[in-house]
């Protein structure tokens, strides 16, 4: 399996996990934040999609993020700016998805764009340097660290939150 195939397969698994995250949840459960320092399932979904959009569209391709170009903030009732990194617990608790259907449309669009971008690459392209704030890293390292590993961690966080509410995890018996 090539590196790109591995990335595509892993991101597809992560996408399926986030698609299933709200299944069977009430609005209250979707926005439940346990005591202490944590996030809601809604926050995890929003953050993951925004990060994926930011990296695949803006950082890797120099294009406007789908969030802005598609007018998704107005459709979903979510903030126009920000993506959750460095956000205080208080601000994270304010993330509220008012239209789950619209938000899932955004999730699907971001997933399509990400997989299309990966499909346009060859192994050599993964060696290209990409500029982040204070440093550069290879495209392959950036995809693995900021998308594959980071987003899969939040997918696991969703399952923990579901378990805290007495619900089954997403993708049970599939490496959930």
Task: Locate the predicted segments by residue.
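A structural signal for long alpha-helical coiled-coils and helix-turn connectors
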Residues: 22, 26, 119-122, 162
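Short alpha-helical scaffold segments that flank and stabilize functional sites
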Residues: 24, 51-55, 117
